[in-house]
Amino acid sequence: MAAKDVKFGNDARVKMLRGVNVLADAVKVTLGPKGRNVVLDKSFGAPTITKDGVSVAREIELEDKFENMGAQMVKEVASKANDAAGDGTTTATVLAQSIITEGLKAVAAGMNPMDLKRGIDKAVAAAVEELKALSVPCSDSKAIAQVGTISANSDETVGKLIAEAMDKVGKEGVITVEDGTGLQDELDVVEGMQFDRGYLSPYFINKPETGAVELESPFILLADKKISNIREMLPVLEAVAKAGKPLLIIAEDVEGEALATLVVNTMRGIVKVAAVKAPGFGDRRKAMLQDIATLTGGTVISEEIGMELEKATLEDLGQAKRVVINKDTTTIIDGVGGEAAIQGRVAQIRQQIEEATSDYDREKLQERVAKLAGGVAVIKVGAATEVEMKEKKARVEDALHATRAAVEEGVVAGGGVALIRVASKIADLKGQNEDQNVGIKVALRAMEAPLRQIVLNCGEEPSVVANTVKGGDGNYGYNAATEEYGNMIDMGILDPTKVTRSALQYAASVAGLMITTECMVTDLPKSDAPDLGAAGGMGGMGGMGGMM
């Protein structure tokens, strides 16, 4: 086991604070509408330019191991805030730095660290309740666009795109961000349910110009089995032909004689049919077939529940207004399933999301909810260069997370104003002893830090602006972009409540642990002794060269 280097008390805390300050100072230059960029060197390819706090934090590793421990703990604050709300990483870092700095001063002055932590925790718990009371629901497109704009560093086009995407696919819809091909940002919306399975035979194509199969008002047969014998399907095919409507078959597979017969019937115009494989594998395939059945008002024909394909009737088939199939995807538009059944299915999947243990499972379940409840929108980010593309894409993803958080828990006044108001409301909070009261004051002082940093990044005097904002009430604050005072919500400067709450809670959590640190342990650096054997060999070879 390697020897350890151990530091105690003030020596440990000073080193830790130095690491905290290096990381926080690098991150906090990005805060606010006039925050600066940070350039990150990469071992290959062009450097990355970013204004995303967590991206900067993740790049920082310090040579001194004790300082690095401090930096890594604050990095954890940024990562946790990012995981919880997708934004607010810089705010969380600024709050953590302030609590740690003021807290360690109090420890050096002889306060009890545990009581300080209890005071900080008490203030934060009270502040969170006040934040919830200040929160305003965020439901209209204008507010969603404003939240997106602020989170994307005052880029209005991004805010509008996200609001438009949410408008099209609903609050539950899936919105993804991809690299675009042009200079302009674009929004692609897929209505209805789309899954990644294309037609089983190109002979089903009835729109040669687009290479797609389009079926108007089709019946939809859902079978959880392989279909290879056409006899099983004859009763259904005859019933569909009599009804004079097309048929879409979604099954585990359609092969051999069955597929050949369907193709022949389609080409002769006897009945219009298309077949696709069911999406997913194993249990997930069964679940997705059931989703499609709910959406289209049909029944999954499965031998597990005693249903046979030969006995299927038109009542067992689902229906939709339109189906479009190309070689890779199938889209079902306007299924006729009942709204109550769809909502029931969505509620059931939501329950599974809460119980899911892996991120992958959770993501797949959320996709299923979106396909049932809304649709899928893709924001394609346009830029002139790859460096700009990466930077812009990161901003759009941040803005998307922020708007989701806003829809979930509402919004508060932005620009650090909400925390100032909360601090003034709990200014009379008292702990059980004087040390806890100091902890409460440390937390209240930290709540001013985001506003002060935003103002500092604009080149103004933080104390003057902070005192002016404190003198106002409600949503009165400082618009750093225009350097004007006014009602922040009216000016469209909003922060999601969840983002502000998460930033404060995670900052206080990690900072409280750091204040109570009394000892730090790390590995001693290994001494790299030169390999004398190798050096001697080289010398000998040199001598031989001289003789020749």
Swiss-Prot record:
Intracellular or extracellular location(s): Cytoplasm
UniProt KW keywords: ATP-binding, Chaperone, Cytoplasm, Isomerase, Nucleotide-binding
Keyword Cell membrane attached: no
GO BP annotations listed: protein refolding
Catalytic reactions of this protein: ATP + H2O + a folded polypeptide = ADP + phosphate + an unfolded polypeptide
Pfam families per the UniProt record, alphabetical: Cpn60_TCP1 (PF00118)
Keyword ATP-binding: yes
PROSITE patterns with a match to the protein in the record: CHAPERONINS_CPN60
Top-rank EC class of the record's enzyme: isomerase
Residues annotated as binding ATP: 30-33, 51, 87-91, 415, 479-481, 495
Enzyme Commission identifier(s): 5.6.1.7
SUPFAM superfamilies: GroEL apical domain-like (SSF52029), GroEL equatorial domain-like (SSF48592), GroEL-intermediate domain like (SSF54849)
GO molecular-function terms, A-Z: ATP binding; ATP-dependent protein folding chaperone; isomerase activity; unfolded protein binding
Gene Ontology cellular-component annotations: cytoplasm
The protein's role, per its UniProt record: Together with its co-chaperonin GroES, plays an essential role in assisting protein folding. The GroEL-GroES system forms a nano-cage that allows encapsulation of the non-native substrate proteins and provides a physical environment optimized to promote and accelerate protein folding.
Subunit architecture: Forms a cylinder of 14 subunits composed of two heptameric rings stacked back-to-back. Interacts with the co-chaperonin GroES.
Family named by the database record: Belongs to the chaperonin (HSP60) family.
This protein's name: Chaperonin GroEL
Phylogenetic placement of the source organism: Bacteria, Pseudomonadati, Pseudomonadota, Gammaproteobacteria, Enterobacterales
Gene: groEL
